[in-house]
Regions:
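A composition-biased, non-transmembrane "mature-region" signal
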Residues: 1-149
Length: 149
């Protein structure tokens, strides 16, 4: 794995894992949906230029994260790019989203001094790890893309 792969979050399957068909990979990614996950995986619209899209909305933070995925059967890889919108600051970011989003509140403590408390928190790995795991278990490469699919 090279430095660019590390920066983009590209992961390769374990050696010896047989690559499945594109239909099986699509089914595995759609099977990630469920009541215990904080996002929804759906088929991509033609305007999104993606085969599958995972969308997560965190209302407490005013944050929307979308991962667009394109299946490339010839190379047995899923190309993924993340997009992030913040409602409060109207910021938009595209590329590979990593880290944790937090909301902090400053209030006075019982002793009268300022106190910082964490209000809401969202770890982007909670969205990407199940998707990446489904792709790697199918024997395909998860290739993070920076600019476009």
């Amino acid at each position: 794995m090279g430095i660019f792969d590390k920066l983009t979050g590209t992961r390769y399957p374990e050696t010896g894992v047989a690559a499945r068909s594109a239909a099986e990979v699509r089914a595995a990614l759609l099977a990630v949906n469920g009541p215990g996950v904080p996002f929804v995986v759906r088929n991509g619209a033609p305007s999104e230029r993606a085969d599958l899209v995972a969308v997560c909305r965190v209302r407490e933070l005013g944050l929307t994260v979308r991962t667009r995925m394109r299946l490339v059967p010839e190379q047995h890889e899923v190309r993924a790019i993340d997009e992030q919108w913040e409602a409060q600051t109207r910021e938009y970011a595209r590329g590979q989203v990593t880290g944790v989003a937090r909301d902090w509140t400053i209030e006075r403590g019982t002793d009268g001094r300022p106190q910082i408390t964490e209000g809401a928190r969202f770890d982007f790995a909670a969205m990407k790890n199940p998707l990446r795991g489904a792709v790697l278990d199918a024997g395909w490469t998860w290739r993070g893309v920076v600019f476009r699919l």
